[in-house]
Amino acid sequence: MITIDFQKMGGLIPAIIQDHATNEVLMVAFMDEKTLNLTLESGKTWFFSRSRNKYWMKGEESGNTQEVVEVLTDCDADAVVIKVKQNGPAACHTGNRSCFYVRWEDGQWVEHSEPLFDPAEVYKK
C-alpha cells in the first residue's frame, strides 16, 4: 500500500491542480494530511496557506470552487496532481483562469492573460 510522505517538506506536499478536460495547470498550492483528507472526503479542494497559517477551501470566498475528478501521486508519493472541474471563471486569486499566466519572453516576464473578474470586488474584506 502506498502512503503519502508528508515528512520530506515538514508536513506539507505540493498539490498541482489541473483542469480535468484540458490538463491546463490552474494552480499550485500546499496540502498537509488534514487538507488532503478533507479533499478526498468532500470532493472539493482544500489547502494549507503557509502565509496565513490556516486551512482554506478553494472558492470559499470567490465562489470559484473546484470539484475533484481524479487524484494522482508521483513515484515518491510526496506530491499530488488533482484534476478538477473548475466552477466559475477563474482559479487564480488575481482573476485569471490560471495562476500561470506570466510567460518568460525575450528576456522578461510578460503577462498573457486578462483577469476574468475584479479581485477587489470579489475579495472584499
From Swiss-Prot:
Transmembrane segments: none annotated. It catalyses: 1-(5-phospho-beta-D-ribosyl)-5'-AMP + H2O = 1-(5-phospho-beta-D-ribosyl)-5-[(5-phospho-beta-D-ribosylamino)methylideneamino]imidazole-4-carboxamide. Pfam families: PRA-CH. Its EC number is 3.5.4.19. Its cofactor is Mg(2+); Zn(2+). GO terms for biological process: L-histidine biosynthetic process. Zn(2+) binds at C75, C92, C99. Gene3D superfamilies: Phosphoribosyl-AMP cyclohydrolase. Keywords: Amino-acid biosynthesis, Cytoplasm, Histidine biosynthesis, Hydrolase, Magnesium, Metal-binding, Zinc. Mg(2+) binds at D74, D76, D78. This is Phosphoribosyl-AMP cyclohydrolase. The lineage of its organism: Bacteria, Pseudomonadati, Thermodesulfobacteriota, Desulfuromonadia, Geobacterales.
